[in-house]
Structure formats: structure tokens, C-alpha cells
Regions:
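Short, aromatic/basic amphipathic alpha-helical patches
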Residues: 151-153, 175, 220-226, 326-333, ...
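Cellulosome-associated attachment modules in secreted, modular CAZymes
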Residues: 367-441
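Boundary at the C-terminal end of the N-terminal hydrophobic targeting segment
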Residues: 26-30
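Structural signature of tandem-repeat unit edges
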Residues: 35, 40-44, 55-77, 87-100, ...
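A recurrent domain-boundary module in secreted/ectodomain proteins
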Residues: 179, 353-370
Length: 441
């Protein structure tokens, strides 16, 4: 990874502010209704101004439709410069149906404190909310918005909190680029990709909040500047900071940069369902001390644990060493000398001769693979395991009871007999095994 690019030269801001402060070219509006000026364009109403700046104040509610001379028109756009310089504007309600927010539409609305972008918005112009210094909260719900160009619509604003709606799938290029006031990002559960430089130079970020850990694991980032966690360094799941990370079993791949710079992460457990781990997935996690990799992983990206200087315990229960796409777990060979690799006893020789894995100074064959459902440890799941669970329930454990064993589940441990992972051994676990047996035949 390269060093973060520097902030735009300050003279650009100065020149931009001078140019944008020049009077807007006066133009006629078609009509006014309830204090809002409109132009008519191809049968649609476009919110505009009266030819002067600072023509709106207080709370403005833009309607979904407006009637003029007996004809009702859908309101579909906020035009260029529409609210520019309206320093007395406090709140604006943008309705569903608005598809375009124009160039510098809210430039220098210094009293505006919050804004919600509706799902229908497909285009937001440069500088749309620039220099809105009192703007603190942005709720972004646009589900099909095109990528932004630099400078972004929100540049030089005072936004501190961004909430991404649950129906948003993509966050555009340059979305919050250089938004130094930003401290918190709350991510919607449907985001699948984040564009280039979306959170670049957001140096004030302190936390990222998510609702769905599985969804977070699979977000496609253009690069590291797309992930707000790079600057925030703290990730919260439903309000609780993630420190002992257990990847959900529904996850089959972990994206590149997924947990980059998650500074309070201490342990990572990757289940058997995961088959691939992307580049730099856990890079620069300085508190990470232990990582357990399940037996399903076959492909690993470059420098997954790079700069995890305290990681001294790596367990990989994959029988065949996963193949790296470019380089190993670390960039600095010194990390291999400080960490111990734990593998299955029968796999030691394979890891000792595998590219990059062989760089570990110490490879121990002491890893234990506990197959959930294989209660008696014979590497098969069958009727005998059902009987073992019954014995645990009735007799309290002559077949293992509530013993705990290492596993790529449940914070790195599993209770023998607890097949469904609810921390109890009961008839529900029997049903899981029976259903597995019936389904495997």
C-alpha cells in the first residue's frame, strides 16, 4: 500500500470560494408556489431561485408535486444554484421523486443543519452542499446514484455524521472525500461496493457502525481509501465494539481491506465456510494477537496480516496449505520469526515446504480440528453422534459433557454436543445432526 495522497492545495479552496461567491446570473423563473420558485422543463417542475442568492429561509418543504394554472407537475429536480447563499435556511425536506440535485444547489447555506437524500436521487452535482458549515448530519438513501466527481457535493461542509440507508447498495466515488469534520459513519446493511476515494482524507473519523457483520465482510472496496475503517480504526456491531471477531458461517469470502486498521481487534476466527481471503484484509491491526483460519480456505491474498506486529499465534486447520496470490501473510519477514503457526499434525510437512508458509520459524502440529456434529471424534457424523448427544443430555457428560475444544467457531471454542451454537446441549442439537445425516444420504 502506498502513502495516503495529500489534501488538495489550499489555494484551490480559496479560488473556488472566490468564484462561487460571484453573483449568479439572473434569470426568470416560471412561477412561485408556497414560497418556492420553479422552472418548467419538459412537463416537470424544477426548484430554482428568483435570480438572486439568499432567497430562502427557515424550514422549506419541497413538495412531490406542484400545481400551476390548473396543471399539476411532478417536482423532479433541484436546479443549479437553487438555494445558493440562503444563509437563513435551517431545514429542507427533499421528497421522493427528486432525481437531480444541481451544481452548487445549496452552496453556502450556512444555517442548514441536516439533510436527507431520498432514494430517488440519481445525480448530485459538484459543490451541491459545499460550505454548509453548520451541516452536521447527512442521511444518504440514494439507491441508484451515479458516481461523484471531485470536488464532491459535500466538500468543505461541516458534516460530522453520515448514515447510509439500508437499501443503498453502492457508495459513489469521492463520496466523503476530504471531509475532515466527519467523525461517524453508520453503514446500511445492503452496501455491496464503495467507490474510489470515497472516504479518503477523512482524518477526523473515530467510529464505523454496522448492522450486519456478514454483509460488511463482503463489501467490494475500490481500494483502501474506500473503507472508512482505515481512518476510524474502530468498528461497532449493533453498538458494541468488535474486539474478538468471529466471522459468520454464512460468509464464503472476506473482501480485500475488510478489517484494515481495526486497531482494537484482538482475535480473529474464520470459519470453515470461508474459501478465500482478500488482500490486506486484516492489515495494520496492532492489537491482534491470535488468528484462527478454518479448513475451507484455499486462496489467500497478499499481506493479509501485514503490520499486525503483535500477532504471535496463527492457527490454520486447512489440511492443504492455502495458496497465496502474490505474497505471504506479512511483508516483514521478522513477523514470521515472532509468530507460531499451528497446523494439523498430518499437515506439518506440507506447510514446511509451502511457499510463504515455510517462512514461519516455528510450525507446530498441535492444531485440533473439531467438526461440529462429530461428537465422538471419529471424523464422521452419523447415528453414533446422536447417541452421544443423548448421553450428554441424560447423564451430564459421560461422552464429553460440556467440555470445550478449539474450533473456528464461537470465539475460537466450541462446546462438545452444542451443534447449533446456542451454548446449550439439548434436543435441538440432536435434530441438527439427524437432518444433516438425512440430507447427506
Amino acid at each position: 500500500m502506498q502513502k495516503p495522497m495529500g489534501r488538495m492545495m489550499m489555494y484551490r479552496l480559496l479560488v473556488t470560494c472566490i468564484l462561487m461567491s460571484l453573483p449568479t446570473v439572473a434569470g426568470a423563473y416560471d412561477f412561485i408556489a408556497d414560497g418556492i420558485y420553479y422552472d418548467l422543463v419538459d412537463g416537470h417542475a424544477v426548484v430554482t431561485h428568483n435570480g438572486q442568492t439568499n432567497c430562502y429561509s427557515g424550514d422549506v418543504v419541497i413538495p412531490e408535486t406542484v400545481t400551476h394554472e390548473g396543471t399539476t407537475y411532478p417536482v423532479t429536480a433541484i436546479g443549479d444554484y437553487a438555494f445558493k447563499g440562503s444563509t437563513g435556511l435551517i431545514h429542507v425536506t427533499i421528497p421522493e421523486g427528486i432525481t437531480t440535485i444541481g451544481y452548487s444547489a445549496f452552496w453556502d447555506c450556512m444555517g442548514l443543519v441536516a439533510v436527507t437524500i431520498p432514494e430517488s436521487v440519481a445525480s448530485i452535482g459538484e459543490y451541491a452542499f459545499a460550505c454548509c458549515y453548520s451541516l452536521r448530519e447527512l442521511v444518504y438513501n440514494a439507491v441508484n446514484c451515479e458516481d461523484f466527481d471531485w470536488p464532491s457535493p459535500f466538500v468543505y461542509s461541516g458534516i460530522a455524521s453520515i448514515t447510509i440507508g439500508d437499501n443503498v447498495k453502492r457508495i459513489p466515488d469521492f463520496f466523503a472525500c476530504e471531509l475532515e469534520s466527519l467523525t461517524t459513519v453508520s453503514m446500511g446493511k445492503s452496501v455491496t461496493s464503495i467507490g474510489a476515494a470515497a472516504f479518503d482524507e477523512c482524518v477526523g473519523l473515530t467510529s464505523v457502525h454496522i448492522k450486519d457483520l456478514a454483509a460488511w465482510c463482503t463489501i467490494s472496496y475500490h481500494d483502501w481509501t474506500s473503507n472508512p475503517l482505515y481512518y476510524a480504526r474502530r468498528l461497532f456491531l449493533n453498538g458494541e465494539e468488535i474486539k474478538d471477531l468471529v466471522i459468520p458461517s454464512s460468509v464464503t469470502s472476506i473482501s480485500s481491506f475488510a478489517f484494515l486498521s481495526c486497531s482494537h481487534l484482538t482475535t480473529v476466527t474464520i470459519p470453515n465456510t470461508v474459501t478465500s481471503i482478500g488482500d490486506y484484509a486484516f492489515e495494520d491491526c496492532p492489537s491482534l494477537v491470535k488468528a484462527t483460519i478454518g479448513n475451507g480456505v484455499t486462496s489467500m491474498g497478499t499481506k493479509i496480516f501485514n503490520y499486525c506486529q503483535n500477532l504471535d499465534n496463527v492457527t490454520c486447520i486447512a489440511g492443504r496449505p492455502p495458496v497465496f496470490t502474490e505474497s505471504g501473510l506479512f511483508y516483514d519477514l521478522g513477523y514470521y520469526a515472532d509468530a507460531t503457526l499451528h497446523v494439523l499434525s498430518e499437515s506439518v510437512t506440507a506447510y514446511q515446504s509451502a511457499t510463504y508458509w515455510q517462512d514461519f520459524s516455528l510450525i507446530n502440529g498441535d492444531a485440533i480440528f473439531y467438526l461440529l456434529g462429530d461428537i465422538n471424534g471419529d471424523s464422521e457424523i452419523n447415528v453414533a453422534d446422536v447417541n452421544n448427544v443423548i448421553d450428554i443430555i441424560i447423564n451430564g457428560g459421560s461422552s464429553g459433557g460440556h467440555s470445550r475444544v478449539p474450533s473456528p467457531y464461537c470465539n475460537g471454542w466450541a462446546i462438545i454436543g452444542d451443534v447449533n451454537g446456542d451454548s446449550e446441549v439439548n434436543i435441538a442439537d440432536i435434530n441438527v445432526i439427524i437432518n444433516y445425516i438425512l440430507g447427506s444420504q
